Amino acid sequence: MLTPLQIYFPIGVVLLVAVVLAFTMLGLANVLGPRRPSLVKQTPFECGSEPIGSARERFGVKFYVVALLFIVFDIEAIFLYPWAVLLLPDGQGYPGLGWPGFISMGIFVFTLVAGLVYVWKKGVLDWAD
């Protein structure tokens, strides 16, 4: 029987090699890399074309709101996936889930749909402005 130290030793070796390799690459890049700044190196890259305007522009708050909504509904999908896997057909799923699991997930989905309707009615997703 293997001890926990014997089981996790290869993982520790791989982790140590990865850390040493990463710091070695960073050190070599710092030592061997050029240190002469120029205007071309400090210009932001925009798909090969000349940049228009400043790189320090403000973005509209709508981008952040949409990003937060994406995260909320992405987390909803993360919570829905295990529940759906537990409800496999043909008796392969978890038998103890039953109606309480279905009702609790229904409440969860209803709450998120109500939030989406609220956000939609408030005009957060309207980009016409």
UniProtKB/Swiss-Prot annotation:
Top class in the EC scheme: translocase
Reactions accelerated catalytically: a quinone + NADH + 5 H(+)(in) = a quinol + NAD(+) + 4 H(+)(out)
Gene Ontology MF annotations: NADH dehydrogenase (ubiquinone) activity; NADH:ubiquinone reductase (non-electrogenic) activity; quinone binding
Membrane-crossing segments per the record: 9-29, 68-88, 97-117
A Pfam family recorded for this sequence: Oxidored_q4
Keywords assigned: Cell inner membrane, Cell membrane, Membrane, NAD, Quinone, Translocase, Transmembrane, Transmembrane helix, Transport, Ubiquinone
Membrane topology qualifier: Multi-pass membrane protein
Gene Ontology cellular-component terms listed: NADH dehydrogenase complex; plasma membrane
UniProt-listed InterPro entries: NAD(P)H_OxRDtase_bac/plastid, NADH_UbQ/plastoQ_OxRdtase_su3, NDAH_ubi_oxred_su3_sf
Subcellular location: Cell inner membrane
Entry EC number(s): 7.1.1.-
Superkingdom to which the source organism belongs: Bacteria
Quaternary organization: NDH-1 is composed of 14 different subunits. Subunits NuoA, H, J, K, L, M, N constitute the membrane sector of the complex.
Protein role: NDH-1 shuttles electrons from NADH, via FMN and iron-sulfur (Fe-S) centers, to quinones in the respiratory chain. The immediate electron acceptor for the enzyme in this species is believed to be ubiquinone. Couples the redox reaction to proton translocation (for every two electrons transferred, four hydrogen ions are translocated across the cytoplasmic membrane), and thus conserves the redox energy in a proton gradient.
PANTHER family: NADH-QUINONE OXIDOREDUCTASE SUBUNIT A, NADH-UBIQUINONE OXIDOREDUCTASE CHAIN 3
Protein name according to UniProt: NADH-quinone oxidoreductase subunit A
Native source species: Anaeromyxobacter dehalogenans (strain 2CP-C)
Encoding gene per record: nuoA
